[in-house]
């Protein structure tokens, strides 16, 4: 019986000798078939090797990343062979608040909106304008400010909000979108709401925690990148802690200040991009001052051809 063109061997050689001669006698023509078969295999491997070599030498897409961290306007100059870029836009975080003596801990600031990474087509442009949003100013109520917007071309991320009392600031979100709500003020401050998805490539900022009127302040909400909000400051049963700021792009929000009979009750100004500032803890010695929110960032990862 033949198997795919190989004749059945009538009798196999049993002693070492001229195997080729014995095999040819046992199955006439099989040597020629084997030679043709292995020659074909060799040709296929040779062709495969040349194809792999061609793939290895072929050019692949490379990237060129530029990061903008200085607040204010900038101009991005495209690389000559860039076709577009993956862009991430992070807005500034809102400043935390301090309240008057006896009013409780201040609310933490909300973190800035995050847009991207999203594909931005170059469309033959030589430059594209953008801006990095400032962090909001932490202050005694009602003087704290919201974080600034960040932009790149037609992309805009909205800054996190501040507050005027013990309630945490809302997370940054565009007009018409319900932003995550700040934690409520109470004996113990409520936690700020986590970020919320806006679309396939955009997410709101996280809200700040509420200040406590006697006990701990609430934590800030979790950011789109999974960063935790700042922890609320501790209270002492009389003076409440400040609320934590909303979580940022690359780190946590600012921690709230601790409630205390005397100063300091200083909250934390975060370093994470777009994070909200912590709210001041309550004291009997005067109004507290909230911490600044963190500025935003714009990352442009060009794809080159």
Predicted segments — roles?
Residues 39-70, 211, 222:
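Glycine-rich, low-complexity segments
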Residues 1-49:
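Extracellular "spike/adhesin" assembly and maturation modules
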Residues 83-85:
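Short beta-strand/loop motifs in extracellular/secreted proteins, especially
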Residues 96-104, 109-230:
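Secretome/extracellular-domain signature
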Residues 157, 273-274:
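Bulky hydrophobic/aromatic "packing anchor" residues in well-ordered structure
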Residues 67-79, 89-154, 246-265, 276-300:
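Glycine-rich strand-loop-strand elements at beta-sheet edges
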Residues 302-305:
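Ser/Thr/Pro-rich, low-complexity mucin-like regions
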Residues 237-242:
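Short Lys/Arg-enriched alpha/beta "domain-start" segment
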């Amino acid at each position: 019986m033949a198997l795919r063109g190989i004749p059945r061997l009538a009798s196999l050689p049993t002693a070492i000798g001229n195997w080729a001669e014995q095999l040819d006698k046992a199955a006439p023509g099989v040597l020629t078939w084997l030679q043709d078969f292995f020659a074909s295999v060799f040709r296929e491997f040779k062709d495969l090797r040349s194809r792999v070599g061609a793939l290895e030498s072929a050019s692949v897409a490379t990237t060129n990343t530029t990061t903008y961290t200085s607040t204010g306007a900038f101009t991005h100059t495209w690389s000559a062979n860039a076709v577009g870029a993956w862009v991430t836009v992070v807005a500034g975080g809102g400043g935390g608040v301090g309240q008057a003596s006896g009013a409780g801990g201040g609310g933490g600031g909300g973190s800035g909106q995050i847009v991207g990474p999203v594909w931005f087509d170059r469309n033959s442009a030589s430059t594209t304008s953008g801006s990095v949003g400032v962090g909001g100013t932490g202050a005694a109520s009602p003087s704290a400010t919201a974080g600034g917007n960040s932009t790149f071309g037609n992309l805009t991320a909205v800054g996190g909000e501040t507050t005027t009392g013990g309630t945490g600031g809302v997370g940054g979100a565009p007009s018409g979108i319900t932003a995550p709500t700040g934690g409520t003020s109470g004996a113990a401050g409520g936690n700020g709401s986590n970020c919320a998805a806006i679309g396939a490539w955009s997410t709101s900022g996280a809200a700040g925690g509420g200040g406590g009127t006697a006990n701990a302040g609430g934590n800030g909400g979790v950011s789109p990148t999974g960063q935790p909000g700042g922890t609320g400051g501790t209270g002492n049963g009389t003076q409440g802690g400040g609320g934590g700021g909303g979580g940022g792009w690359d780190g946590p929000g600012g921690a709230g200040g601790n409630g205390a009979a005397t100063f300091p009750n200083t909250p934390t100004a975060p370093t994470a991009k777009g994070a909200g500032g912590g709210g001041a803890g309550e004291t009997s010695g005067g109004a507290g001052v909230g911490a600044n929110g963190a500025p935003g960032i714009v990352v442009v990862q060009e794809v080159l051809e």
